[in-house]
Every structure is written in structure tokens, then in C-alpha cells.
């Protein structure tokens, strides 16, 4: 039985490679934790958005039902035509359909949120108010990702050192047990040293390892550049989304509420027709829906920025 020990430097560099691989695995574990956290927050944002849309369509359906009941009385009294009466029925039916679709989307979002939370039962949050997630305009990419990229390149460099160490003499140790009659249990130990006579095969392996290490360095640098660029883009996008949300909060939402309230009031007083009423209601609803979408876009961007920066 003979066991090769390799060169004196090979075990050392293999140990260095093992430590590097362990550190790389730890960084990858940290990345997975961050991505799981981000995925839960994305699902939470999607749930809040779906819930807000469901509430929006519920309110629109209630308004349409009230206006439809009013239209029935006005049609029976001869104040509106059959065409206007049909338009109001169509509006009520459309709002009901939208509300049902929003409810289905909310159910899907709730199931997805429970799934990413690894829960077998529905997760019912206490606070379901649509709001902006706390976010900071981080300047630096996440050190977890940067370290992971460096560790990947370092593994290839460790492989270069291992291949270089094979230029040195390799040691081996052997043991044998023989039985030569009439003698038994004849044990012997052997120690061997081997020197490479031709270096060309090993030079080729070293050259290949160097090329792989250089490629890994280029890839790591490209990943770092892409990460910095992504963080910068997310930071700019978050700032833009914040301004968009501020526009709705400061002015547009108030105008939408006033538009709907005045349109319903004018219709109740018979000072506007159904066509103008429907147009005003649609405009008001679209503004509130755009606000919900703007908040959702802001929150998703904030989650992405938190994931890739610090």
C-alpha cells in the first residue's frame, strides 16, 4: 500500500483553497438571506397594492350602485333617457367586474405572501395601510456581494498556486506486509521522492489555471461594475418615484376626491348628464389607481436598493 503525499507546498495551498471556499460559501449564504428577505418584502408590497386596489374598486362599486339606484328613479320619472339609464347600468356592471377581479388578485397575492413566508396558513398582517417603506439613498454597493465576487476570483488564484506547487518534488510513503515461509508478518515501510522529468504537461496546466484566474478576475470586476451601476440607477429611480408619489399626495389625490364629489353632487341635482359623470368618475378613479401604482413602484425600488446596497 502506497500513499502519495504530494509536494510540501501542495497541502498548504489546498488548505488555503478550502478556507477560501468556506468563506465563499458563507458569503453566498448571506446573499441568500438578503434575497429571501427582499422576496418577502416584495410579496408584502404586492399584497398591499392588491389590497389597496381591491378597496378602491369596492368604493367605486358602492358609488356606482348608489348612482344606479338614483338613475332608476330618474328614469321612471322620465328625467333621463333609456340610453343614459343603460350607460349607468353598464357602469355599475363594469365596477362590479373590476371589484371581483381585484378580489381574485388579492387572493393570489395573499397566497404568494404566505408562501414566501414559508407558512402553511394565511398570514394576516396587522397593518394593511398603503404607505411608503422606509428607505435611504445608499451610496455604496453591498459589501456582501463585493466580497462574494472577490472570493470567487480568489478561488481560481488558489488553484494556480496549487498547480505551481506541483513543480516541486512529490513525496510518498508506503507500507507492506509479507508472508514468506517459514516467516510471517514481515512488515516494511518505504519513503519515496519523485522529481518531474518533463515540465511541459504541468506548465500547460498552470497556464490553463492562470487563464481561468484571469477570466475570473475580469468577471469579478464586471460584476462589481454592474452592481455599482445598478445601485446608482436604483437610487435615481427611487428619487424619481418619491417625487411622483409626492405629486399625488400634495395635489392629485385631493383633486380626484373633489372631482368625484362634485360630479356626483351635480348629477344628484340634475345639473350634468351621465356621460360627463362617467368621464369624471373614470378620471378620478384613474388618479387614485395611479397613486397606488406609484407607491408600489416606490416600495419595490426601495426593496431592491436595500438588497444591493448598504
Task: Give the label of every model feature segment.
Residues 1-16, 27-34, 38, 52, ...:
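A glycine-/polar-enriched beta->alpha junction
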Amino acid at each position: 500500500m502506497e500513499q502519495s503525499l504530494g509536494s510540501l507546498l501542495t497541502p498548504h495551498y489546498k488548505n488555503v483553497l478550502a478556507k477560501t471556499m468556506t468563506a465563499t460559501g458563507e458569503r453566498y449564504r448571506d446573499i441568500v438571506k438578503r434575497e429571501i428577505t427582499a422576496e418577502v418584502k416584495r410579496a408584502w408590497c404586492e399584497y398591499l397594492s392588491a389590497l389597496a386596489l381591491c378597496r378602491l374598486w369596492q368604493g367605486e362599486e358602492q358609488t356606482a350602485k348608489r348612482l344606479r339606484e338614483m338613475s332608476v328613479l330618474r328614469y321612471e320619472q322620465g328625467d333621463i333617457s333609456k340610453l343614459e339609464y343603460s350607460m349607468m347600468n353598464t357602469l355599475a356592471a363594469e365596477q362590479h367586474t373590476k371589484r371581483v377581479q381585484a378580489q381574485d388578485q388579492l387572493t393570489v397575492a395573499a397566497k404568494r405572501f404566505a408562501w414566501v413566508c414559508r407558512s402553511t396558513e394565511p398570514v394576516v398582517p396587522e397593518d394593511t395601510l398603503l404607505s411608503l417603506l422606509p428607505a435611504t439613498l445608499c451610496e455604496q454597493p453591498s459589501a456582501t456581494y463585493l466580497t462574494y465576487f472577490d472570493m470567487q476570483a480568489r478561488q481560481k488564484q488558489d488553484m494556480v498556486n496549487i498547480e505551481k506547487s506541483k513543480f516541486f518534488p512529490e513525496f510518498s510513503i508506503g507500507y507492506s506486509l509479507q508472508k514468506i515461509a517459514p516467516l510471517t508478518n514481515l512488515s516494511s515501510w518505504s519513503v519515496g521522492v519523485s522529481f518531474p522529468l518533463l515540465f511541459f504537461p504541468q506548465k500547460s496546466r498552470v497556464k490553463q489555471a492562470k487563464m481561468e484566474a484571469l477570466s475570473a478576475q475580469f468577471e469579478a470586476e464586471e460584476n462589481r461594475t454592474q452592481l455599482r451601476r445598478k445601485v446608482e440607477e436604483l437610487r435615481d429611480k427611487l428619487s424619481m418615484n418619491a417625487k411622483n408619489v409626492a405629486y399625488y399626495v400634495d395635489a392629485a389625490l385631493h383633486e380626484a376626491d373633489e372631482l368625484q364629489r362634485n360630479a356626483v353632487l351635480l348629477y344628484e341635482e340634475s345639473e350634468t348628464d351621465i356621460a360627463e359623470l362617467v368621464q369624471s368618475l373614470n378620471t378620478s378613479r384613474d388618479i387614485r389607481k395611479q397613486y397606488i401604482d406609484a407607491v408600489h413602484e416606490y416600495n419595490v425600488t426601495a426593496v431592491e436598493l436595500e438588497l444591493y446596497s448598504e
